[in-house]
A protein has these predicted regions:
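Conserved RNA-binding domains used in RNP assembly and mRNA/RNA metabolism
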Residues: 2-122
């Protein structure tokens, strides 16, 4: 992984974004003053930058294949601390195709109602 700027990214790159999120917490004033920042990490597919009033980094999380609808995080660029390129677009597409091929080769066993044992989670 290497640190990159938004300008270096191409749509389809797999990225990890470290950014500061707004939060609400109840604690003493000392704790508020000691560490007020809350950092988050989001990773996914870079979909671009958008926004009218503020520029937002779009990070794709999942896609509904039938409609080609993307679920995405919309992160204000001014809150981004760093962006790491996990895998360039070309390698990401290759990895996804390999995973899809593996999924087609895996056979799932169907269980009948009487065959399933009850499991108690403690």
């Amino acid at each position: 992984m290497r640190r990159v700027n938004v300008e270096e990214l191409r749509k389809g790159d797999l990225i990890l974004v470290r950014w500061m999120d707004a939060s609400e917490i109840r604690c003493s004033m000392d704790e508020h003053e000691g560490s007020p920042e809350i950092y988050c990490k989001d990773w996914g597919v870079y979909l671009g930058v958008s926004g009218r009033k503020r520029r937002l980094l779009l990070v794709g999380k999942d896609v509904v294949e039938v409609h080609n609808d993307w679920g995405a995080a919309r992160i204000p660029l001014e809150l981004v601390d760093e962006i790491l390129l996990v895998m360039p677009r070309k390698e990401t597409l290759k990895a996804i195709r390999e995973i899809q091929a593996l999924g087609r080769r895996v056979r799932l066993r169907k269980w009948r109602k009487g065959e399933i044992e009850r499991v108690r989670v403690v």
